[in-house]
Amino acid sequence: MCIRDRNHAKEFDSNGDGKADMVACHPGWGCEKIISRHFEELGLGEFINPIKADYSAAMADIISRYKNGKSVLFYTWTPNWTVGTLKLGEDVVWIEAPFSETKVVSVPNATKSKLNMGFGVNDIRPAANVDFLKANPKVEKFLKKASIPLADIAAQNLKMNKGEKSEKAIKKHAEEWIKANQKTFNSW
Protein backbone atom coordinates (compact mmCIF):
# COMPACT_ATOMS: atom_id res chain seq x y z
CA MET A 1 0.00 0.00 0.00
CA CYS A 2 1.34 3.40 -0.94
CA ILE A 3 -0.10 6.41 0.88
CA ARG A 4 0.77 8.51 -2.20
CA ASP A 5 -1.93 6.61 -4.08
CA ARG A 6 -5.01 8.78 -3.59
CA ASN A 7 -7.25 5.69 -3.35
CA HIS A 8 -5.20 4.43 -0.42
CA ALA A 9 -4.95 7.87 1.16
CA LYS A 10 -8.76 8.10 1.15
CA GLU A 11 -8.91 5.02 3.40
CA PHE A 12 -7.36 7.15 6.16
CA ASP A 13 -9.40 10.28 5.41
CA SER A 14 -11.69 11.37 8.24
CA ASN A 15 -12.66 14.87 7.01
CA GLY A 16 -13.50 14.13 3.36
CA ASP A 17 -10.71 16.11 1.68
CA GLY A 18 -9.20 13.03 0.00
CA LYS A 19 -6.01 13.15 2.07
CA ALA A 20 -5.02 10.67 4.75
CA ASP A 21 -5.28 12.09 8.27
CA MET A 22 -2.37 11.20 10.54
CA VAL A 23 -2.08 12.01 14.23
CA ALA A 24 1.34 13.61 14.47
CA CYS A 25 3.15 15.26 17.35
CA HIS A 26 1.83 18.08 19.46
CA PRO A 27 3.29 21.47 18.44
CA GLY A 28 6.58 22.09 20.23
CA TRP A 29 7.49 18.44 20.73
CA GLY A 30 10.84 17.31 19.30
CA CYS A 31 9.17 14.69 17.13
CA GLU A 32 7.12 17.44 15.45
CA LYS A 33 10.31 18.75 13.82
CA ILE A 34 11.26 15.31 12.50
CA ILE A 35 7.77 14.65 11.15
CA SER A 36 7.73 18.10 9.51
CA ARG A 37 11.07 17.31 7.87
CA HIS A 38 9.73 13.96 6.61
CA PHE A 39 6.68 15.72 5.17
CA GLU A 40 8.82 18.36 3.46
CA GLU A 41 11.51 16.04 2.09
CA LEU A 42 9.07 13.34 0.96
CA GLY A 43 6.36 15.66 -0.33
CA LEU A 44 3.76 14.08 1.94
CA GLY A 45 1.70 17.23 2.49
CA GLU A 46 -0.07 16.58 -0.81
CA PHE A 47 -1.34 13.21 0.47
CA ILE A 48 -1.45 13.44 4.28
CA ASN A 49 -2.83 15.96 6.78
CA PRO A 50 -0.74 15.92 9.95
CA ILE A 51 -3.05 16.37 12.93
CA LYS A 52 -1.12 18.38 15.52
CA ALA A 53 -3.81 18.70 18.18
CA ASP A 54 -3.44 17.53 21.76
CA TYR A 55 -1.97 14.04 21.32
CA SER A 56 -4.16 12.27 23.89
CA ALA A 57 -7.36 13.78 22.50
CA ALA A 58 -6.35 13.04 18.90
CA MET A 59 -5.47 9.45 19.84
CA ALA A 60 -8.84 9.03 21.57
CA ASP A 61 -10.39 9.88 18.19
CA ILE A 62 -8.09 7.40 16.42
CA ILE A 63 -9.08 4.63 18.85
CA SER A 64 -12.75 5.41 18.31
CA ARG A 65 -12.25 5.32 14.53
CA TYR A 66 -10.43 1.98 14.81
CA LYS A 67 -13.19 0.49 16.98
CA ASN A 68 -15.70 1.60 14.33
CA GLY A 69 -13.82 -0.32 11.63
CA LYS A 70 -12.03 2.65 10.07
CA SER A 71 -8.39 2.69 8.93
CA VAL A 72 -6.06 4.69 11.17
CA LEU A 73 -2.65 6.32 10.76
CA PHE A 74 -0.73 7.79 13.68
CA TYR A 75 2.70 8.50 15.09
CA THR A 76 3.52 6.75 18.36
CA TRP A 77 6.42 5.41 20.36
CA THR A 78 7.00 2.83 23.05
CA PRO A 79 6.39 2.70 25.84
CA ASN A 80 3.14 4.58 25.42
CA TRP A 81 -0.45 4.02 26.46
CA THR A 82 -1.54 3.97 22.82
CA VAL A 83 0.16 0.62 22.20
CA GLY A 84 -1.52 -0.69 25.33
CA THR A 85 -4.87 0.08 23.70
CA LEU A 86 -4.15 -0.68 20.04
CA LYS A 87 -1.96 -3.77 20.35
CA LEU A 88 1.10 -3.92 18.12
CA GLY A 89 0.92 -6.94 15.85
CA GLU A 90 -2.80 -7.45 16.49
CA ASP A 91 -4.50 -4.12 15.83
CA VAL A 92 -1.72 -2.05 14.27
CA VAL A 93 1.80 -2.49 12.86
CA TRP A 94 4.86 -0.31 12.53
CA ILE A 95 5.35 0.96 8.98
CA GLU A 96 8.62 1.85 7.33
CA ALA A 97 9.86 5.36 6.69
CA PRO A 98 11.92 5.84 3.50
CA PHE A 99 14.92 6.92 5.57
CA SER A 100 16.01 7.14 9.15
CA GLU A 101 18.58 8.97 11.22
CA THR A 102 19.74 5.58 12.47
CA LYS A 103 20.43 2.17 10.98
CA VAL A 104 17.81 -0.31 9.86
CA VAL A 105 16.71 -2.33 12.88
CA SER A 106 14.83 -5.55 13.62
CA VAL A 107 11.37 -4.56 14.74
CA PRO A 108 8.67 -6.95 15.93
CA ASN A 109 5.08 -6.24 14.87
CA ALA A 110 6.09 -4.35 11.73
CA THR A 111 5.27 -4.51 8.03
CA LYS A 112 8.57 -6.38 7.55
CA SER A 113 11.25 -7.82 9.85
CA LYS A 114 13.83 -5.03 9.44
CA LEU A 115 12.96 -1.45 8.67
CA ASN A 116 13.77 2.22 8.95
CA MET A 117 11.70 3.61 11.80
CA GLY A 118 12.18 7.21 10.66
CA PHE A 119 13.38 8.16 14.13
CA GLY A 120 16.33 7.26 16.28
CA VAL A 121 15.67 4.58 18.88
CA ASN A 122 15.63 5.94 22.42
CA ASP A 123 16.63 4.13 25.56
CA ILE A 124 14.92 4.49 28.89
CA ARG A 125 17.43 4.68 31.70
CA PRO A 126 17.27 5.81 35.29
CA ALA A 127 19.00 9.02 36.30
CA ALA A 128 19.88 10.14 39.80
CA ASN A 129 21.79 12.83 41.64
CA VAL A 130 25.54 12.01 41.71
CA ASP A 131 25.93 12.87 45.40
CA PHE A 132 22.91 10.71 46.28
CA LEU A 133 24.38 7.73 44.43
CA LYS A 134 27.77 8.19 46.13
CA ALA A 135 26.01 8.12 49.49
CA ASN A 136 23.81 5.16 48.47
CA PRO A 137 25.85 2.69 46.39
CA LYS A 138 23.21 -0.04 46.78
CA VAL A 139 20.69 2.20 45.03
CA GLU A 140 23.14 2.76 42.17
CA LYS A 141 23.68 -1.01 41.85
CA PHE A 142 19.90 -1.56 41.88
CA LEU A 143 19.27 1.08 39.21
CA LYS A 144 21.95 -0.38 36.93
CA LYS A 145 20.25 -3.80 37.05
CA ALA A 146 16.60 -2.71 36.94
CA SER A 147 14.83 -3.34 33.65
CA ILE A 148 11.06 -3.23 33.14
CA PRO A 149 9.59 -4.59 29.88
CA LEU A 150 8.23 -1.89 27.57
CA ALA A 151 4.86 -3.68 27.40
CA ASP A 152 4.55 -3.38 31.19
CA ILE A 153 5.40 0.33 31.06
CA ALA A 154 2.85 0.86 28.27
CA ALA A 155 0.22 -0.97 30.35
CA GLN A 156 0.94 1.30 33.32
CA ASN A 157 0.80 4.38 31.05
CA LEU A 158 -2.63 3.20 29.89
CA LYS A 159 -3.84 3.09 33.51
CA MET A 160 -2.67 6.68 33.97
CA ASN A 161 -4.39 7.71 30.74
CA LYS A 162 -7.61 6.20 32.08
CA GLY A 163 -7.37 8.43 35.16
CA GLU A 164 -5.24 6.45 37.61
CA LYS A 165 -2.57 9.15 37.84
CA SER A 166 -2.48 10.30 41.44
CA GLU A 167 0.67 9.63 43.44
CA LYS A 168 -1.27 7.01 45.42
CA ALA A 169 -2.46 5.26 42.24
CA ILE A 170 1.02 5.23 40.70
CA LYS A 171 2.50 3.81 43.91
CA LYS A 172 -0.18 1.08 43.78
CA HIS A 173 0.78 0.30 40.16
CA ALA A 174 4.42 -0.09 41.21
CA GLU A 175 3.53 -2.30 44.17
CA GLU A 176 1.34 -4.51 41.95
CA TRP A 177 4.09 -4.82 39.37
CA ILE A 178 6.66 -5.75 42.01
CA LYS A 179 4.33 -8.36 43.49
CA ALA A 180 3.67 -9.89 40.06
CA ASN A 181 7.40 -9.83 39.23
CA GLN A 182 8.87 -10.45 42.68
CA LYS A 183 11.56 -12.90 41.53
CA THR A 184 12.86 -10.48 38.89
CA PHE A 185 12.67 -7.56 41.31
CA ASN A 186 14.60 -9.50 43.96
CA SER A 187 17.35 -10.30 41.44
CA TRP A 188 18.11 -6.60 41.07
PLM segments and residue spans:
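A conserved helix-loop-strand patch within extracytoplasmic ligand-binding domains
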Residues: R4-V23
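Short coil/turn segments
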Residues: A24-G30, D131
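Extracytoplasmic/secreted envelope proteins and their assembly/folding machinery
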Residues: E32, S36, S56-M59, I63, ...
